[in-house]
Amino acid sequence: MTLEYSISAGHPFCMGVMSQTNGIHIAMPFPESEGKECGMLLYKAGHELARIVFPECYKMGEVYVLFINMQMEADYTYLFFCGEEQFTDPYAHIIRGREKWGRRKEDRPRAAFAEDTFDWEDDMPLRIPYEDSVFYSLHVRGFTKHASSQVSARGTFAGLAEKIPYLQQLGITAIECMPVYEFDEIIPNPAYQESLKLRDNGQAAYLEEPAWKQRINYWGFGDGETYYMATKAAYAKDPQHADRELKLLIRQLHKNGIEIILQMYFSPRYTQGYIREVLRYWVSCYHVDGFHLFGTDIPMRLLGTDPYLKHTKLIHENPEADAVYKGKKIPYYRNLACYGDAFRYDARRFLKGDEGMLSVMAEHMRQNSSLEGVINHITDYRGFTLSDLVSYDRKHNEE
């Protein structure tokens, strides 16, 4: 089968690939691509269909901006190439090849073309003030994976949607989800192949212990191969339509008065512009209510002054509210918030009955900046669950 297509100029309004009725619009950066042939590898049903070379005349800086006029089909996937190197679209909205949790395919994951046909039914973020908020942090897979959850779609977005009545009974106003973007949960060990060589050469005695082959990154944080604009397919009852399943969950949460906050970790290798694009995308396409951001180089000044994010909760250990609002009046909607660990440790000492903690807790309760919210939490993923915290009065390590 031969693919018929034509290439014309595009519009540099946003990065990534956008599927349209008569083709695809591409705005994709190719760093260090001078003198190299760049383009797209198009696949149908897993087999290479076409190798499309991008003309240099459609290059702006490092970005190829063009439109490919072609007949689209539902099962198309793609990769990009730059010289001899192939890479997956870092702006991909759908990733194929990671549908099974903890299983790695030999092939590089490919991007698929997303269709924006979801009916939001006039849904919009809830904008609940911080002073009226009670957050409930959870892991989408872990929250309902056990049989005790009593849901039909355990460990999925659909399973979480079944627990909305339970969440309402708790009296919470928002769930804060650990990463739901397409992170790589498999952590390979570079020493594993070396250990195999030593074993095969009869030198296994030099190994103190057999090297582990791989481990699971359960939480989702880390610097592996991550696609921040794609929904985690392994978290869906129907992995082929994970994006739709998450949108259904968010729409149902909003109908029941519950916000959704997404935890996101960015390592220093991601640019400030990319981080902002990721957040804008999730607000625009998924109607999320906010983000809890982790990382050493999070551009809080840039994000805090972005007009597209003014109604979006932005939570960080240092939201830089003084710099964001310097010389400006108090914001009509406080979207910035500080998330620190001081309250967690002091609250535990207070519950234990340590001396001198009453005044400390009173000071925590009085903290209420006019510029930013203050998130007081007593447990998170770095330690006990809330149930464990209140179930024991002494250590039980011997058991």
Describe the function of each predicted region:
Residues 28, 138, 167, 177, ...:
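Conserved, mostly hydrophobic/aromatic
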Residues 102-107, 112, 287, 300-399:
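Conserved alpha/beta catalytic core and glycan-binding cleft of carbohydrate-active enzymes
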Residues 114-178, 182-183, 220-221:
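An acidic-aromatic substrate-binding cleft motif
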Residues 149-156, 187-255, 266-285, 396-399:
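Aromatic- and acidic-residue-enriched carbohydrate-binding clefts of CAZyme catalytic domains
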